[in-house]
Amino acid sequence: MQLQINIASHPLIQHWSGILKNDNNPGTILRTACSELGKWITYEIMREWLVTETIELKANTTISLISSHYKYIIVIIMPYGFILAEGARSLLPTANIVLVNYNDIINNVPDQLNSFTKILVLDLFLDEATITPLLNDFIKKGAVLSNIKIACLECGTSQLNQLGQIWSKLEIYTTKVNTNVDKEKCSREDDFKDKFFV
């Protein structure tokens, strides 16, 4: 495994991660925690990822704005990735949204991507079986792997090992790498689904 794994350490990420670990919290609080984590993990990604350009105004004044030459796409792995997206979209309000239900693309990715396309994939728990087909589709359409970032709350080492064998340069942002997750079921979605949708 040679993936670039980034364990987000922002104080607010640590706070909301702590809230999420308390299963005694009601679903509304857990959902809020996920939304906030989606926002702050996205913030950590954007710090090094966004491309800005300098605009000259009158009176020798310049301002820095997000470059209009780049196109941003947020890929939401349904149904739980949507909870992360609630926070992430506030930071990238002009990004195109693509909804993915497991391996079936609901709202298709544009047919042509290029080096000016930046893609953020959001999922609650990393699932190699979903990510690999998506990456294959993105690369086939012209995307550059270095412009693709994965954001999730948790990922298992077995999933990371599988991804690392194919996508050694892939960059993943998460709050936790779980070494105890079962290889056949590396998701804890069942632990949350009844609480999120009440």
From Swiss-Prot:
Keywords: Chloroplast, Plastid
Protein name, as recorded: Uracil phosphoribosyltransferase homolog
Pfam families the UniProt entry points to: UPRTase
Main location class: plastid
SUPFAM superfamilies assigned to the protein according to its UniProt record, in alphabetical order: PRTase-like
Subcellular location as annotated: Plastid, Chloroplast
Family as reported in the entry's similarity comment: Belongs to the UPRTase family.
A GO term from the CC aspect: chloroplast
Residue stretches spanning the membrane: none
InterPro entries: PRibTrfase_dom, PRTase-like
